[in-house]
């Protein structure tokens, strides 16, 4: 595991629901009441580290450290963890970190047969712009040499897009695949503190980018315990090229601000 991972933030159910079908460890510092409700109802406390005891839900403390990285940033952006600390927290909770599982998150091309999605007949998708909110925007540009999409994010400080760089390597992040899924997203009712709710059960339009092209399809997630599935226009499960994949769940309201070419 990496020497440093973070910043570590509080848990939200929209992330948990993506992990639940794979029995993945959910590691964070605190969580929304809605997230704890999912943990309680679906009996996921045995794989939840850093949660809250709302609804009498069992908890397991996380292990982390503070590092401002020499920057003037808000306190909530200074908490980090590491492979060693994650293993320690899991050991403290009696949670094993190894088990057999042969299912992947997406349907990736089989490396044993040399299979790939050549994106034949697909429309051009060499640049992609995604808007989540007024200040949360990402853009990608396809680099044919590395066959990856290089990532940029909008900076409120500079007022422009800047390269998204891995702090440990100094290199710009690049992805073999991009998947953009549109979904109804709205604030939980009541005093939720602006915690957002993703209506996964609604499904929606999906855009798969790879090799500088795009395929339009549909995604589905029948319940929190069901995996997210992506289908092409023929109804077949979308074939993903092997490699690092960026997943964006985008509010239907931001559809007009989504563009690619």
Q: Where are the predicted features?
A:
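A surface/extracellular/periplasmic glyco- and lipid-processing/surface-interacting theme
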Residues: 3-261
């Amino acid at each position: 595991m990496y020497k440093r991972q973070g910043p570590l933030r509080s848990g939200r159910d929209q992330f948990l629901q993506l992990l639940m079908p794979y029995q993945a460890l959910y590691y964070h510092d605190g969580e929304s009441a809605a997230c704890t409700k999912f943990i309680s109802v679906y009996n996921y406390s045995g794989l939840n580290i850093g949660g809250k005891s709302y609804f009498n839900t069992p908890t397991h403390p996380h292990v982390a450290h503070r590092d401002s990285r020499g920057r003037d940033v808000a306190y909530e952006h200074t908490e980090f963890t590491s492979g060693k600390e994650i293993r320690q927290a899991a050991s403290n909770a009696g949670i094993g970190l190894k088990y057999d599982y042969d299912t992947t998150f997406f349907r990736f091309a089989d490396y044993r047969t040399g299979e790939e999605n050549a994106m034949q007949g697909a429309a051009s998708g060499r640049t992609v712009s995604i808007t989540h909110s007024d200040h949360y925007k990402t853009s990608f540009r396809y680099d044919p040499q590395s066959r990856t999409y290089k990532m940029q994010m909008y900076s409120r400080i500079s007022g422009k897009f800047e390269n998204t760089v891995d702090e440990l390597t100094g290199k710009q992040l690049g992805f073999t695949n991009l998947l953009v899924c549109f979904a109804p997203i709205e604030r939980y009712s009541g005093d939720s503190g602006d915690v957002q709710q993703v209506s996964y059960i609604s499904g929606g339009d999906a855009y798969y980018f790879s090799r500088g092209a795009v395929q339009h399809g549909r995604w589905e997630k029948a319940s929190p315990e069901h995996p997210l599935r992506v289908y092409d226009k023929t109804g077949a499960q979308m074939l993903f090229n092997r490699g690092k994949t960026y997943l964006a769940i985008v509010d239907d309201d931001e559809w007009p601000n989504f563009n690619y070419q």
